[in-house]
Every structure is written in structure tokens, then in C-alpha cells.
Amino acid sequence: MQDFKSLGLSRWLVESLNAMRITHPTAIQKHCIPEILKGRDCIGGAKTGSGKTIAFAGPMLSQWSDDPSGMFGVVLTPTRELAIQIAEQFTALGSSMNIRVCLVVGGESIVKQALELQKKPHFIIATPGRLAHHILSSGEEVVGGLSRVKYLVLDEADLILTQTFAADLSTCIAKLPPKQKRQTLLFTATITDQVRALQNAPAQDSKPPLFAYEVENVDNVAVPSTLKLEYLLVPEHVKEAYLYQLLTCEDYKDSSVIVFVNRTTAAEVLRRTLRSLEVRVASLHSQMPQSERINSLQRFRANAARVLIATDVAARGLDIPTVELVINYDIPQDPDTFIHRSGRTARAGRSGDAISFVTPRDVSRIEAIEERINKKMDECKKVHDTAVIRKALTKVTKAKRESLMDMEKANFGEKRKTQKKKNLAEKSLRA
């Protein structure tokens, strides 16, 4: 069986991995690490929980340690939470070598980040929007080092290459060395047309050919065999009661659960409702201050909260290994979003369940999802007793009504408007 030393990683890094009890490389690591060390650009496709971060961090850290000075690599990722997670992994792996990692994400002090960038950190882990903001508004003494980096990584590349990030990504890439003078690594759980277009681009004379590797074909990547997919037919007006019954039924009363919703207001209503019903719950959505988002994740990871109500900021790449159940309370419009949500459970060979609440208006979305994953969902039989639903309905309805009143008193809607204005102001600064 191969080990990390045989892949070509530096001895100090192999020792760091061993200290973290990471001794045997996964498929994506075995194939990508040696090729990246040869200087090749790389596209890596593998399901979440398969070790993609070490597949790119390993060779980057190994080569950096040969000449540990200045800005060496930039990792761009679509969400703050994923950026924080990657920064933690770089810091842990490089701790014995006095590595300097700078986290550049929204929700944190721009001034503090600029001061850190000025000190020329070795690795910058960033969301495209915040790094673009620094490039456009900070002086050369802050961002000048970016023009000499050796690596650019796009993690969750399928999302970063969408129109949502296009302008910010262009700003970031324009500041980096040209592609002939840096290595570019793309990692994703979903190989989209945009990613394949890069894979099929003409080779560059001055560089070795691009290396592309998918652990399995895309449909297997999308849905692990250990993931059990079910649907529950639910009338729209009693969704909260069904959710409460499912969370407290015999099968799931002690389980670690992520409940996905499409809107921040729904996340807040459910969090407050379940909390008043004495469910240990936390939430994660874009209207929360960054400190609260981090606190929610820490509580969920530590099992202080067993239920996390989340919008899709949590669906991407987050490593929460113990999640046993994902509930799609609202069905997403994009089937790939469903895949990423469901990928929060059944990670790294573990089993897991994903249950989707289906109202009459969701049927076409479910059909599109089933076509995308080439698999039919089974009907969930765990909550079917109408009498039990009715019994819970009064209690849940009362809790929801009180939650809505509390949100009104707390001016939740006004806070959302203020946050939206703030986000728009930041975008206009980068326009």
C-alpha cells in the first residue's frame, strides 16, 4: 500500500500527516499529488469527504518548504466557512515550519486583513469577492506579492466558474502571474461543462500537459452508494410539524442532522421554532455576522447542537464527518445543489440518509433531480401517522407563531434589508 512519502512529499510534511493520523493516501491524493509535484496543472474530481484539500495542499506545502519566502499560493473558494476550514488545514499541516496563512473573507475587518497581507503571508485562503476588494482598493504594498505566487487553486471549481463569481475571479486572476508562470489546480465534486472546457483547452508549449483525474464517473461521484435517498410527501402548511416529528422519531431522535432551506427567513423561523420545542438547534445563513456563523458551526461539530438549519452557504465542502441525516426542507432549483447538500452525509464511506420534503409544486424539481442522479428516490415511511402529526401540529404551530412575533420585535426583516444594502455597497466598490 502506498504512503505519502512514496508520493514525493517532504519528510516534515509526512511526519505532520502522521501526527494527524493521516497515513494512507486516498485515490484523489495518490493520483494528483505526484503529478502536481511534476509541475502540471491539475483538474481533480472526487466526491466530498475524499481528501481533496490534502491533494492540493500537500504538494503546495512540500514545494514551498524548499524556499519558504513571500506569497507562494492562493486558494479561492466560494464560501467563508470553507475558506476557514481550508486555512485551518494549511495551518495545522505547516505548524512545524512556522507557516503564515492569511484568511481573506467577508465579515472580518478589512484593515486587519490588509495589515496581514502587507506581511507577505505564504498562503492566502480567500473568497473571490473579498480578495478582489483588496486588489482594487489596497495599495501595491498590500497586494503586490500576488504577482509572484506559484500556485492558484480553485476549490469547488464548478461553482467558482459560474457567472456569480465571474467579475471578482477576473480581478483576482489579473493580479496573479500569467498562467504560463504559475500552476493552476481545480478541484470539484461536480465536473461541469465549464470545468470540462478548461480540461479540453489546447496545451501550452512552455508547460507540461494538464493532468485530469476523476475518482469515479460523474454519477457515482454525485451520489455515494452508502447514501439512502428518500422523499416525504408533505402538505405545505404543515411542513414544520412533519419536520419536528421526523427529528424526534425513534430513528433520528439522537441523530446529527442538517436541514436545508432556500431562504434566510425560513432558517431563522425554523431555528426559533425548534429551539422553543427544546430541540438543540443552531443555524447558518448569510444574514448572520461571521462570528455567529463560526460559533454555530463549532456548536454543531461539538454536538452542543444536534440540528443545523442552513441555507446553501453550508452545502459546499464543509467537513462535518458525523452528519447522519440531511433534510431538504425546501427543494433546490438546481439538481447539482441537491447533490452538494446530500453530500454532507455518507462521507468517506460512511452511511447516511437524505430525506426531501416534497409539496405538490416540488414534483418537477424532484423529477429533474432523479434524472440528474439517474436514481429514483424511495418514499420515507418513518412519519406517516396522521394522528401523530395532528398531535404535534398544535404545539408546533404555537411555537412558530411565537417565533414570528419574536422576529418582528427583533426587527429581523429590517436587519436583512440593512445587510443587503451593505452587501450591495461592497459589490459597487468592486464594480
From Swiss-Prot:
Note whether rRNA processing occurs among the keywords: yes
Instruction: Kindly state which keywords UniProt assigns to this record, in alphabetical order.
Output: ATP-binding, Helicase, Hydrolase, Nucleotide-binding, Nucleus, Ribosome biogenesis, RNA-binding, rRNA processing
Taking every annotated instance into account, which residue ranges of this chain make up the domain Helicase C-terminal? 242-389
What are the EC numbers?
A: 3.6.4.13
- DNA repair listed as a keyword: no
Which CDD domains does the record cross-reference, listed alphabetically?
A: DEADc_DDX49, SF2_C_DEAD
Reactions catalysed, as given in the entry: ATP + H2O = ADP + phosphate + H(+)
Which spans does this entry mark as compositional bias, Basic and acidic residues? Answer: 406-416
The protein in question is named: ATP-dependent RNA helicase DBP8
Taxonomy of origin reads: Eukaryota, Fungi, Dikarya, Ascomycota, Saccharomycotina
